[in-house]
A protein has these predicted regions:
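Acidic, metal-associated active-site segment
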Residues: 46, 96-107, 119-136
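Acidic catalytic patch
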Residues: 66-115
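A generic structural signal for short hydrophobic patches within well-formed alpha-helices
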Residues: 10, 44-47, 76, 144-145
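Short, hinge-like loop/turn segments at secondary-structure boundaries
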Residues: 54-58, 87, 154-158
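Short, well-structured N-terminal submotif of metal-dependent ribonuclease cores
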Residues: 1-39, 46-66
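A general structural signal for well-ordered alpha-helical segments in protein cores
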Residues: 44, 54-57, 76-77, 123
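Acidic, PIN/NYN-like endoribonuclease modules and their adjacent C-terminal/linker elements
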Residues: 2, 109, 113-116, 127-159
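Conserved glycosyltransferase catalytic-site signature
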Residues: 7, 41, 120-124
Length: 159
């Protein structure tokens, strides 16, 4: 089994998030025993901001048995296709990253509907990479992933 890890799971542990750190550590420990843990280059880049050097980040990855696996053309093309669909269909609604529920926000002054891109292409690259190069993805961003990558198995905590 190959398990991909999203940045938020690793940041929970690195930044010691009191709400999610234990669940995230348990997820990583559980799936590490089932097979290979991997991250894509975007997760690597996002994690690098938390380390004094690339050498320190690489040591962390070795110590946690996490392997950097680069995206292939299939993953990158899929991320672009899903991003295009997301951009076209998102209209004026926001989406909760946890439950996937959509809602609108209006300006308190002029009552105009506020539009905002909640997800950038990197979120799509991480998910497409996981879909094409692993069995499942560890992430707390399940609402977004369910809406845009229904074909991807996502675990945010042990059930």
């Amino acid at each position: 089994m190959i398990t991909s890890i999203d940045t938020n799971i690793l940041l929970d542990i690195l930044l010691v998030d009191n709400k999610f750190a234990l669940d995230s550590k348990n997820l990583i420990d559980f799936y590490n025993q089932k097979g290979q843990l991997i991250i894509c280059e975007l997760v690597y880049a996002e994690l690098s901001s938390q380390f004094p050097s690339g050498k320190e980040l690489n040591k962390f990855l070795i110590d946690t048995s996490i392997k950097l696996v680069y995206s292939n053309e299939k993953s990158l093309a899929l991320s672009g296709e899903r991003w295009k669909k997301y951009s076209r269909n998102r209209k004026s609604t926001h989406q909760c990253h946890s439950c996937g529920k959509k809602f609108s926000i209006h300006c308190p002054h002029c009552k105009h509907t506020v539009r905002m891109r909640q997800h950038i292409i990197s979120d799509f690259i991480i998910a497409a990479h996981a879909l094409n190069q692993s069995t499942l993805l560890l992430s707390r961003d399940r609402g977004f992933l369910k809406a845009n990558f229904a074909d991807l198995e996502v675990k945010g905590k042990l059930s």
